[in-house]
UniProtKB/Swiss-Prot annotation:
InterPro entries hit by this protein: FAM90, Znf-CCHC_6
PANTHER family in the cross-refs: FAMILY WITH SEQUENCE SIMILARITY 90 MEMBER A11, PSEUDOGENE-RELATED (PTHR16035:SF14), PROTEIN FAM90A1 (PTHR16035)
Region Disordered, residue ranges: 1-42, 69-387, 410-437
Biased composition range(s): Low complexity: 180-197
Pfam families associated with the record: zf-CCHC_6
Protein family membership: Belongs to the FAM90 family.
Protein name, UniProt field: Protein FAM90A7
UniProt source species: Homo sapiens
Signal peptide per UniProt: none
Basic and acidic residues bias (residue ranges): 74-89, 97-111
Length: 464
């Protein structure tokens, strides 16, 4: 009987049994997991739900077929007002409706008053109201347009004048004719009519009464420079610089009642070129060429003399008055002078080249001074090729005009530098001319302080 069975039919049955088992395993609907599989400490990274991980088959992100989609609940037509009601026309309106009607009638009653005011300011004839009630809206349409301010025409009042010009009388304004040359062109035109009312009056005390301009210049207010002229018989007419009209706010109004507070401007001649030669701290004054002068009294016009330039062998007077003598540093000491050691003298001290003042600078007061006349010797140490040279003798003399003169004197051979008395015995003519005893000074000090050159004889003749 086993042989009679077909193997193909048996295989078909096996396949059917396997497919049925697969269909039973597949989830038909949303299956609730067993309680032992849920763990609240786990969280899925895909859907963010707790109880399973991202690799679990329970995640709805992996099986979209099992996910539930929220169904639409349909339209709610009852909440939408598809057929709004029309307002009812009540025959007997309530108290609220009466108040609304009164508010609508009030602006209509105010229309005639508004039209009358518009007619006064604008000068337009009042428009007749239209039967449909649009006249009130059209009359006020020009007020809603963004335009400039409405001009107010008043014929009874005159335009307001400058307060400074208003409180001036006609006699005060007549005296401004002498100052019209320094005013701006606009001020000239405004004051020309007022100055022609009365005759010109000559003022002798202070500057003319000038109206203060509407704008003021920041900073100190400059004064008015008045120069007297010889052509006027009374000496009261003054000239004002023409360049003063270029600056704004140059003229300041000097009222009669405020003269006790501000001093009057005195007329004194002042050189116009004094501003170029004044230094710092001096009072400045302006002339015709000044653009913006500073406020300063006119009397203090000082012209300081220029500082004279000194020649290479001239000594400043400040050093002569204090009894100080300084030599200009024009030469460098020879290398032979550095062979001697440092030595000091009672009348001349050793100084460094940094302490030796130059001719152009002001010498310090800490330098040593020399007597009125003194004859000094300076042993010349030549180079190796010049042996047996004679020492140099210099005679300093003070002249009558306050200057110093130096001269070189010829001296015999000097073999013993340690004995200064022998030198005085050999040169008697030097001791007669000198007013102080001669003191031997080391050559190193003389080279640094005096710096005597071979051309000093020529300079002596020039100074005398």
């Amino acid at each position: 009987m086993m042989a009679r069975r077909d193997p193909k039919s048996w295989a078909k049955r096996l396949v059917r049994a396997q497919t049925l088992q697969k269909q039973r395993r597949a989830p038909v609907g949303p299956r609730s997991p067993p309680p032992d599989e849920e763990d609240p400490r786990l969280k899925c990274k895909n859907c963010g739900a707790f109880g399973h991980t991202a690799r679990s088959t329970r995640c709805p992100m992996k099986c979209w077929k099992a996910a539930l989609v929220p169904a639409t609940l349909g339209k709610k037509e009852g909440k939408e007002n598809l057929k709004p009601w029309k307002p009812r026309a009540e025959a007997n309106p309530g108290p609220l409706n009466k108040d609304k009607g009164e508010k609508e009638e009030r602006p209509r009653q105010q229309d005639p008053q508004r039209n009358a005011l518009l007619h006064m300011f604008s000068g337009k004839p009042p428009e007749k109201p239209l039967p449909n009630g649009k006249g009130s809206t059209e009359s006020s349409e020009h007020l809603r347009v963004a335009s400039g301010p409405m001009p107010v025409h008043t014929t009874s009042k005159r335009p307001r004048v400058d307060p400074v010009l208003a409180d001036r009388s006609a006699t005060e304004m007549s005296g401004r004719g002498s100052v019209l040359a320094s005013l701006s062109p606009l001020r000239k035109a405004s004051l020309s009519s007022s100055s022609s009312l009365g005759p010109k009056e000559r003022q002798t005390g202070a500057a003319a009464d000038i109206p203060q301009p509407a704008f003021r210049h920041q900073g100190p207010e400059p004064l008015l420079v008045v120069k007297p002229t010889h052509s006027s018989p009374e000496g009261g007419c003054r000239e004002v610089p023409q360049a003063a009209s270029k600056t704004h706010g140059l003229l300041q109004a000097v009222r009669p009642q405020a003269q006790d507070k501000r001093p009057a401007v005195t007329s004194q001649p002042c050189p116009p070129a004094a501003t170029h030669s004044l230094g710092l701290g001096s009072n400045l004054s302006f002339g015709p060429g000044a653009k913006r002068p500073a406020q300063a009294p006119i009397q203090a016009c000082l012209n300081f003399p220029k500082k004279p330039r000194l020649g290479p062998f001239q000594i400043p007077e400040s050093a002569i008055q204090g009894g100080e003598l300084r030599a200009p540093e024009n030469l460098q000491p020879p290398p032979a002078a550095t062979e001697l050691g440092p030595s000091t003298s009672p009348q001349m001290g050793r100084r460094t080249p940094a302490q030796v003042p130059s001719v152009d600078r002001q010498p310090p007061h800490s330098t040593p001074c020399l007597p009125t006349a003194q004859a000094c010797t300076m042993s010349h140490h030549p180079a190796a090729g010049h042996d047996g040279a004679q020492p140099l003798r210099v005679l300093f003399r003070r002249l009558e005009n306050g200057r110093w003169s130096s001269s070189l004197l010829a001296a015999p051979s000097f073999h013993s530098p340690e004995k200064p008395g022998a030198f005085l015995a050999q040169s008697p003519h030097v001791s007669e001319k000198s007013e102080a005893p001669c003191v031997r000074v080391p050559p190193s000090v003389l080279y640094e302080d005096l710096q005597v050159s071979s051309s000093s004889e020529d300079s002596d003749s020039d100074l005398e």
